[in-house]
Amino acid sequence: MEVLTDFPQPASNGISGQIIHAMLTVHHLERSGSQRILWLLEELGVPYTLKRYKRDPLTKLAPPELKAVHPLGKSPVITDGDETIAESGAILEYLVERYGAKAQGDLAGLRPAPGTPEYRQTRFWMHYAEGSLMNWLVMKLVFVTIPTQPMPFFVRPIARQLCAKVQAKLIDPNLATALAYLEAHLDTHAWFAGKQISIADFQMSFAVEAALARGADARQFPRLDAFRARMVARPAYQRALAKGGPVVMS
């Protein structure tokens, strides 16, 4: 585990001038969805300590040390004073509620006003990212990986055939439907909730990265690719990437 204390650049459109009493800690697993937490913190200019954890080289799972932070042993997890918070969506909402109230400029829409179309879009994408889309992306990764694992040579052809059939009949059609839906939505929305970047874009960012890294042809999804380009071009995203490392396992 590596520990790094970061003091992000003061954000001209974030929370410059807001007093931060306690150092927030991000428990960051390499190549995981916790990257979006770093991105939000960099956008807001919130100081934080970054604790980086490496995946098990064989299982690719989180190391057991994370269970000392939270019983589930997963990432992302943050500690902020006496608070320990897990799950990406819950963490993002907490950070915006606590540190994003004074966000200005293009971050002013992080939390759309209740009752607005932008609010309803934000709520939908906050749930859809992990509740639906990431399920298919994780299944895709699992069924691509299984045939590459050690097994008796006579079992490998069966495993390869079975995994290919599951992908063709179940995973790939559902992923195609999901990505087509995202592409159509981004045809009429610059960001997922509307004209301004919102918390929904941070939540959706990892799923978009994963989809484009795991086989979605950017030429078939130009609007999805353009969303990713806008996201990656942001200086705060680049700072988060430099500190957290590559985003997804390919």
Predicted regions and their residues:
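Conserved beta-strand edge residues that scaffold enzyme active sites
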Residues: 55-56, 200, 245
